């Protein structure tokens, strides 16, 4: 078995893909013509977005959706970069909100946290051990 996808359920798939393109430099791999599903070219593990309508059809018992008006869910998307302050500033410039400023952890890693316009929590971090 291998880890293949992280799928984030959002109110607007195309807007979420566009945000990740503008904020973090990812390229769009695919956007379904219905607009209900799309993927970014994000390396070995695919980062994908699906509509809340698709989530409802996949999760018959319901699910907890993410919203910028609520506390973040207990999960994050961690993006590794050599320049956290620059990535943090760029994300804020294109619509992210700051959840935690850039800081250096006791083990030497530099991290910050932003929230996407749809409410998803994103950690920006240097590689561990550098």
Where are these regions (language model features)?
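N-terminal amphipathic/basic helix or basic patch
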Residues: 1, 8-11, 15
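Vicinal oxygen chelate
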Residues: 1-5, 27-79, 86-115, 126-130
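Conserved beta-strand-loop-alpha-helix junction that forms the acyl-donor binding cleft
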Residues: 10-13, 82, 106
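Conserved active-site tyrosine of GNAT-family acetyltransferases
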Residues: 16-21, 91, 119
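Short glycine-/small-residue motifs
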Residues: 121-124
């Amino acid at each position: 078995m291998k880890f293949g996808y992280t799928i984030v359920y959002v109110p607007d798939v195309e807007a979420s893909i566009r945000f990740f393109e503008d904020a973090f430099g990812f390229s769009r791999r695919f956007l379904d013509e219905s607009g209900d599903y799309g993927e970014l070219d994000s390396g070995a593990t695919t980062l994908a977005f699906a509509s809340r309508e698709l989530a409802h059809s996949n999760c018959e018992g319901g699910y907890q959706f993410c919203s910028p008006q609520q506390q973040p869910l207990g999960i994050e998307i961690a993006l590794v970069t050599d320049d956290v302050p620059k990535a943090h500033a760029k994300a804020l410039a294109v619509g992210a909100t700051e959840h935690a400023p850039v800081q250096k952890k006791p083990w030497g890693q530099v991290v910050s946290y932003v929230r996407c316009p749809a409410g998803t929590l994103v950690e920006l971090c240097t590689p561990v051990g550098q």
